A protein has these predicted regions:
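Short alpha-helical donor nucleotide-sugar binding micro-motif in glycosyltransferases
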Residues: 82, 272-277
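Aromatic "clamp/platform" in nucleotide-sugar-dependent glycosyltransferases that forms part
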Residues: 285
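Nucleotide-activated donor-binding/catalytic signature segment of Leloir-type glycosyltransferases, i.e.
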Residues: 244-268
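Glycosyltransferase donor-sugar binding loop
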Residues: 38-44, 177, 230-245, 263
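Conserved acidic donor-binding segment of nucleotide-sugar-dependent glycosyltransferases
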Residues: 320-327, 336-341
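Short hydrophobic beta-strand element within catalytic cores of glycosyltransferases
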Residues: 298, 302-305
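Membrane-proximal helix-turn-helix segments that form the acceptor-binding/catalytic region
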Residues: 128-148
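Conserved donor-binding/catalytic core segment of Leloir-type glycosyltransferases
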Residues: 194-219, 232
Length: 374
């Protein structure tokens, strides 16, 4: 069998990039005989370093990360490239793929990492045309694929219900914690002019469904009794309009230095930001997995998190939960994790055992089973 993997939609700094870089790294460690072609963009090639004769990277121009160009290439050019390479199966871990592969007699396996278009369409970043195109392509790809991989049982149940597809077509494969959070070596990457004490951290994309303003409202209440604590956001800004709303709220409600934004930060600094934080908070409305809470657990950082969607499934009893719409509940969660040292210590111990259940070697092994790689 000849397999192709389409990773052309990968953007620098995106969660999909985390998936794809780890997938490639662990795939190259696995023994198999099949020929594999991996389609990637130029700015992504630096993250790959294969020494395998049976794995070949096919480099595509960076402009294909734009969804409009990507759709055209994927639907009208990629199938012919696959046919020319005599590919038997395509794996697309990018939420959608070519919808006419059956005409080319090519098996299609899709991985879905989002349910946003169906449950929180109005909170998606980007313009409405882009978002409608994304939803349309995801729906058509789900119906067209031969097998579908999702990140949680919550995601499987939701997709099966919304799209009316057969359960036995859908496989649940959990993601893993990135190796940089697991290394026993001491991490020496520290930010200049940053005080690594008395702060709460939230690492997330700046999008409306991540509910950042509710964190700020809760923190404003929390500050009345915890004046020295700061709130630090490490953001990837995907919705500029929403970020301006956040900045306006901060300017009107907080003194200078109480809220810190670290935008577009290199991932190498995250280990020590997690490790030295008083706690990690994540108030998302909608997740089919969510890696950052597990990363926090790996650095002995207690986690306060939304009680919605897949988050309870993924974090189990190793996190403290709150209602993301209830400002007082979020505030009380922050207070408890700061004030109740014994409870926080128990959460840290649970988290330290819990995150170890999620590793990329297992993710790749289970995916290879679905792909029938021997």
């Amino acid at each position: 069998m000849t397999l192709a993997i389409d990773m052309v939609g990968t953007n620098l700094g995106s969660g999909t990039r985390t998936y794809n870089t780890n997938f490639c790294e662990y795939l190259e460690k696995k023994t198999f005989n099949e020929k594999i072609y991996i389609f990637i963009t130029k700015n992504y090639k630096a993250d790959t370093n294969t020494q395998r004769d049976n794995i070949k990277y096919i480099i595509k121009p960076n402009f294909l990360t734009n969804i409009f160009f990507r759709v055209v290439w994927m639907q009208f050019f990629l199938p012919f490239e696959l046919k020319k390479l005599k590919v038997d199966k395509l794996y697309s871990p990018m939420n959608f793929g070519p919808v006419f592969l059956k005409l080319f007699k090519i098996n299609f396996v899709l991985a879905l990492h989002s349910n946003l278009p169906w449950v929180y369409f109005s909170k998606m970043p980007g313009n409405i045309i882009r978002n409608k195109l994304t939803k349309f392509m995801m729906e058509k790809s789900i119906l067209a694929c031969d097998s579908l991989i999702v990140d949680s049982h919550f995601a499987k149940n939701e997709i099966v219900s919304m799209m009316n597809i057969k359960k036995d077509k859908v496989f649940v494969i959990y993601l893993g914690v990135d190796q940089k959070y697991l290394s026993p070596k001491e991490n020496n990457y520290f930010l200049n002019n940053f005080d690594y004490k008395d702060y709460i951290i939230s690492i997330l994309s700046c999008v409306r469904y991540h509910n950042i303003i509710n964190i700020l409202k809760a923190f404003k209440l929390f500050k009345k009794d915890n004046n020295n604590t700061r709130l630090v956001f490490v953001l990837q800004i995907l919705d500029k309009k929403y970020f301006l709303e956040i900045k306006k709220y901060v300017d009107n409600n907080f003194f200078h230095g109480e809220i810190i934004f670290l935008n577009g930060l290199d991932n190498k600094y995250l280990v020590n930001l997690y490790k030295n934080a008083n706690l990690f908070v994540f108030s998302s409305y909608c997740e089919v997995f969510g890696l950052t809470s597990l990363e926090a657990m790996a650095q002995n950082c207690p986690v306060a998190i939304s009680n919605t969607t897949a988050l309870p499934e993924i974090n189990g009893n190793a996190a403290h939960y709150f209602d993301p719409d209830n400002i007082k509940d979020i505030k009380e969660s922050l207070r408890i994790l700061i004030a109740n040292k014994e409870y926080t210590k128990t959460l840290i111990l649970k988290g330290n055992n819990h995150f170890k259940k999620f590793n990329w070697e297992k993710t790749v092994l289970e995916t290879c089973h679905v792909l029938e790689l021997n």
